[in-house]
Amino acid sequence: MHTLKNELDKLISYVGDRKEITSYDLEQLTSSQTINQIFIMLDAIARKQRDKVLTLYYDLIELKESPFGILALLARQCNQLLQVKNLDDLGKDNGTISKEIKIPAFAVGKLKDQSKMFSIEVLLSMVEACAKTDELIKTGKINDRVGVELILIQFSQN
């Protein structure tokens, strides 16, 4: 029941002042389960919990998420963390950050908290590693599953 209430609260926050909830809104929030796993994975990366990071990754693979899709979500999340960290460092409030990077207001606080676990340099390195791996996968120079594993290991080891 608690989970359902949380999901409804997210949905209400996501649609804001609109009077109608669309199927698009529901799709966006349903895909949040995978995004939530990525969020947890980034927490584990920040804490250098390599085994947990890889377990989360393999769980996503078991759920039929593609490594390339996981990489895209990881890159997106790292980009958002970087943007939030930069705007927070400039003293912007949550509402302004929400508008500037076009994410729901409820997500800004979580991203701010998580961004504090990373330096700007580490986030930049992660974004660059994701872009490089994306290129290597697309050009056939590395297997997608291995490419993502290498990034996860690189950033979660002590």
Predicted regions and their residues:
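Conserved beta/loop motifs at nucleotide-recognition and modification sites
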Residues: 1-158
